[in-house]
From Swiss-Prot:
Signal peptide (UniProt feature, chain positions): 1-24
Matches recorded under Pfam families: AtDEF-like (PF25052)
Cell location: Secreted
UniProt keyword terms in alphabetical order: Antimicrobial, Disulfide bond, Fungicide, Plant defense, Secreted, Signal
GO cellular component: extracellular region
Disulphide bond pairs: C34-C77, C43-C63, C49-C75, C53-C76
UniProt xrefs under InterPro entries: DEFL (IPR010851)
Family the UniProt entry places it in: Belongs to the DEFL family.
GO BP: defense response to fungus; killing of cells of another organism
Protein name as catalogued: Defensin-like protein 272
Length: 79
């Protein structure tokens, strides 16, 4: 009985982590959060975005593709 409870608890934790990861990915790719209404800054690495992002910590600066079919990468500055 206790092994079933442990298994269910572990399953709940794993599912919640997967859902949280998917939500974070959608948030990063959101044009509203990334500020793509501003002039777009093309990048190859996140280091290319530090100046555009105005000294934000490295964990809030991204170089991402704005869409599934885009080959260009743009700077994304999270608040």
């Amino acid at each position: 009985m206790s092994s079933k409870i442990k298994f269910v608890a572990l399953l709940i934790v794993v599912i919640s982590l997967l859902l949280n990861n998917a939500q974070s990915t959608r948030e990063i790719l959101s044009a509203e959060i990334c500020g793509w209404n501003d002039p777009a800054v093309h990048c190859k690495t996140k280091e290319d975005c530090f100046e555009k992002c105005g000294g934000r910590p490295a964990k809030k600066v991204f170089c991402v593709r704005p869409g599934d079919h885009s080959y260009d990468r743009l700077c994304c500055c999270r608040a």
